[in-house]
Regions:
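Extended, small-residue-rich solenoid/repeat segments and analogous flexible loops
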Residues: 1-33, 37, 151-156
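Glycine-rich hexapeptide-repeat left-handed beta-helix
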Residues: 1-4, 37-45, 51-53, 62-67, ...
């Protein structure tokens, strides 16, 4: 069952189907696909799903995205959990059962294979993805700033 907050912005070409819950100030950008046809997809406040992303679930794995999350252009999230204040880089892929803890960055092009979990505050890069270091306070702050920038951009 769709539950879409009135302050959500869904741009032309984007598709939201199935059991999907979108909280306040979420933005779904051009040509993104959010398919909650197997299990539920929940996207938290102030999060943005950028152009050409694909969000999907499996029959065993729902998809949960926390608050202040930015999902970069053409990223794929499949049956995973993304906690608050995370940046998923462009063309990154996060697969079933994986869990990205809060205040983390998954770098552009990274492949997070099934059932992986990384510590809070990690920089996660590579194929297959691995945590290479902890983020600085400034880097963590930039994740929040980016999400807030997208909220403003979506209202123009």
């Amino acid at each position: 069952m769709k539950k879409i907050n009135p302050k959500v912005e869904i741009f032309p070409g984007a598709h939201v189907i199935g059991d999907v819950s979108l909280d306040e100030d979420v933005s779904i950008w051009y040509n993104a696909v959010v398919r909650g046809d197997n299990k539920q997809i929940v996207i938290g406040k102030n999060s943005n799903i950028q152009d050409n992303c694909v969000l999907h679930t499996s029959s065993e794995h729902p998809l949960k995205i926390g608050e202040n999350v930015s999902v970069g252009h053409a990223a794929v999230l499949h049956g995973c959990e993304i906690e608050d204040n995370v940046l998923i880089g462009m063309n990154a892929t996060v697969l079933n059962g994986s869990h990205i803890n809060k205040n983390s960055i998954v770098g552009a092009g990274a492949l997070v294979t099934e059932n992986k979990e990384f510590p809070e505050g990690s920089l996660i890069i590579g194929v297959p993805a691995r945590a290479v270091r902890q983020l600085s306070p400034e880097e963590i702050e930039s994740i929040t700033k980016n999400a807030k920038k997208y909220v403003k951009l979506s209202k123009k």
